[in-house]
From Swiss-Prot:
It comes from Methanosarcina acetivorans (strain ATCC 35395 / DSM 2834 / JCM 12185 / C2A). InterPro entries: Nict_dMeBzImd_PRibTrfase, Nict_dMeBzImd_PRibTrfase_arc, Nict_dMeBzImd_PRibTrfase_sf. The lineage of its organism: Archaea, Methanobacteriati, Methanobacteriota, Stenosarchaea group, Methanomicrobia. Belongs to the UPF0284 family. GO terms for molecular function: nicotinate-nucleotide-dimethylbenzimidazole phosphoribosyltransferase activity. This is UPF0284 protein MA_3887.
Length: 349
C-alpha cells in the first residue's frame, strides 16, 4: 500500500497542525501507561513532546519521553520530522498540564484530569469546550485544513471509560508492548461504579461522560471541532482509539461529521489487542487515513520496535505523517528525516 492509505491528492492551501497537551492522574496507576519510564514521569511526557517537536530536544523535562524496556523514542519524533519537512504552521494547546513546556502554548485554563476512579475526572468540561471553540473561531479564517493531535499519557484508559459510558464495546490500544487490557477494564469498572454509571447510561449526555470518565484533552478537541463547524475547514483528528472516542462524543453531540476524518498509524490499525477498525466502522467515520513510516527499513533498532508494536501512536504522529503525504513527501524522505532527528537526540540506537 502507499505510505498514506487512502492516498491523498488534494493539497490544502492553508493547513495547520494543532496538538492538545494534557495530563490525567489516571496515568499514575502503576503499569497502566508506558508513555514514560515510570508512572510519575508520565507527568512530563506531553511537555517533553512539545519541546521535542518545537526544538528537536527536551529543555525543562528531566528525561526524553521514551517507552521502556528498549527506550523506543516517543512518536513526537515523527511529528517533528513531518512538520519540519512540510513547514506547516502549528500551535500547542495546554488543556490541563501538570508540567508546562518551555515553548509557546495557548492556555485553555484547564485543570489536570483526576483519576477516573474518582467521582469527577474532569472539572469545568463546558468551560474548556467553550474556550477551545472560541480559539477555533479565531483561527478558522487563517486555514482551510486542520490536523488536531494529542499528547496525554493514560488517554487510552479514559477513552475506554468514555466509550463504555456511551455504550460502545471494544478494546483500546496501548503505548505498551503488552496491552494491559485487564487492568484498564478493572480501572474503568471502578470508575463507572464511583460515578454511579452503567454501560451506555450516558449515551444522551456525552459531556457528562467526559466529566465522569474522560480527560481534559477531550473537551478541548471537541471545542476546536465545534469552532470549525459550518466552515470550509476540513478537520482531521490525529490519533488512534483516543480520537475514535472523541469522534464518538462528537457524534453523540449531533455535530455534522461530513468534513471530519481520522488519521493514525499502521501500528494502531494492526494492534490485535484493540478494536480500532471495528470501532471506526461502528461509528461510521467517513475516512480513516493510515500512515506507514516504513520503520522496518530503518537502520535504527529503536525504530524497529514500532514494527513489533512496542509503541504505536502519539503527539499526532499519524496525522502529521498524513500532512506530510499531502505535501508530497515520500516515505523514504520521511524515514530519513526521522533518523536524523533520532541521531541528534542519540535516541533509538
Amino acid at each position: 500500500m502507499a505510505w498514506i492509505d487512502p492516498e491523498v491528492t488534494k493539497k490544502p492551501k492553508k493547513p495547520m497542525f494543532l496538538c492538545v497537551l494534557s495530563n490525567t492522574k489516571t496515568a499514575h496507576i502503576p503499569k497502566l501507561s508506558a508513555a514514560g519510564k515510570t508512572a510519575e514521569l508520565t507527568d512530563y511526557t506531553p511537555a517533553g513532546d512539545a519541546e521535542l517537536i518545537e526544538t528537536g530536544n527536551i529543555i525543562s523535562v528531566p528525561v526524553l519521553p521514551m517507552t521502556p524496556p528498549y527506550d523506543t523514542p516517543t512518536p513526537a519524533i515523527m511529528t517533528r520530522s513531518a512538520l519540519k519537512l512540510t513547514e506547516a504552521p502549528y500551535h500547542f494547546i495546554n488543556s490541563g498540564l501538570i508540567v508546562t513546556p518551555e515553548v509557546p502554548c495557548i492556555d485553555l485554563k484547564a485543570k489536570p484530569g483526576e483519576d477516573i476512579r474518582e467521582p469527577i475526572a474532569v472539572r469545568d468540561v463546558q468551560g474548556i469546550y467553550e474556550r477551545a471553540k472560541f480559539l477555533a473561531k479565531r483561527l478558522r479564517s487563517q486555514i482551510d485544513h486542520v490536523v488536531i493531535g494529542e499528547s496525554i499519557p493514560g488517554g487510552t484508559t479514559t477513552a475506554m471509560g468514555v466509550l463504555n459510558a456511551l455504550g460502545y464495546n471494544g478494546n483500546v490500544s496501548s503505548s505498551a508492548d503488552e496491552n494491559p487490557l485487564e487492568l484498564k477494564k478493572q480501572v474503568v469498572e471502578e470508575g463507572m461504579k464511583a460515578s454511579g454509571l452503567t454501560f451506555g447510561s450516558l449515551k444522551d449526555e456525552p459531556m457528562k461522560a467526559i466529566a465522569c470518565m474522560g480527560d481534559p484533552m477531550m473537551p478541548a478537541v471537541i471545542g476546536l471541532v465545534a469552532g470549525f463547524q459550518g466552515t470550509e475547514v476540513d478537520v482531521v483528528l490525529a490519533g488512534g482509539t483516543q480520537m475514535a472516542a472523541v469522534y464518538a462524543i462528537i457524534k453523540h453531540l449531533g455535530f455534522n461529521t461530513e468534513k471530519l476524518a481520522i488519521a493514525t498509524t499502521r501500528y494502531v490499525v494492526e494492534d490485535k489487542s484493540a478494536h480500532f477498525v471495528e470501532l471506526t466502522k461502528t461509528l461510521e467515520v467517513p475516512v480513516v487515513y493510515i500512515a506507514d513510516p516504513g520503520f522496518g527499513k530503518s537502520s535504527l533498532k529503536g525504530l524497529h520496535r514500532y514494527e513489533t508494536g512496542t509503541i504505536k501512536e502519539g503527539a499526532g504522529a499519524g496525522g502529521a505523517m498524513y500532512l506530510a503525504g499531502l505535501f508530497g513527501v515520500t516515505q523514504d524522505e520521511f524515514r530519513s528525516e526521522v533518523e536524523n532527528v533520532c541521531k541528534l537526540l542519540k535516541a533509538g540506537q
